[in-house]
Amino acid sequence: IEKLRSRYTVVVLTVLSWSIAVDCSRHNGISWDGILSCEFLGHYKPDAEAYQKGADLLRLEPDQAMMVAAHAGDLQAAMKAGLHSAYVHRDGESFGIFGELDSAPEWDVNARDFAELERLLLTQVSTTA
């Protein structure tokens, strides 16, 4: 995540309360540029307003933001709200696209883990910048 933060603003959009998200992040040694709790936004995922309001608070148009998740429902809702999507496989939490397909065509980015996501997104930036 640190390498991604060198090029992108990395913010969590979570259904957890802000305090629980902060505690979980600290416990796992993860630093974010920000944490947006649906509790604060007044709209919960998968409501499109949660994603749109999150982008708005970051002064972004939805198509300037990307939802990264291991859950199809999160990604589908984010795409309906106008965001880009990145699927990251997480054992025990993800559906099994990598056992069957090289990628799921509906997502903008498909990664086997966060290291691959980092490589794909940083390569994408350097080739398009």
Give residue ranges: language-model regions.
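Catalytic-core regions built around general acid/base machinery
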Residues: I1-R7
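Asp-based, Mg2+/Mn2+-dependent phosphohydrolase catalytic module
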Residues: L13-A129
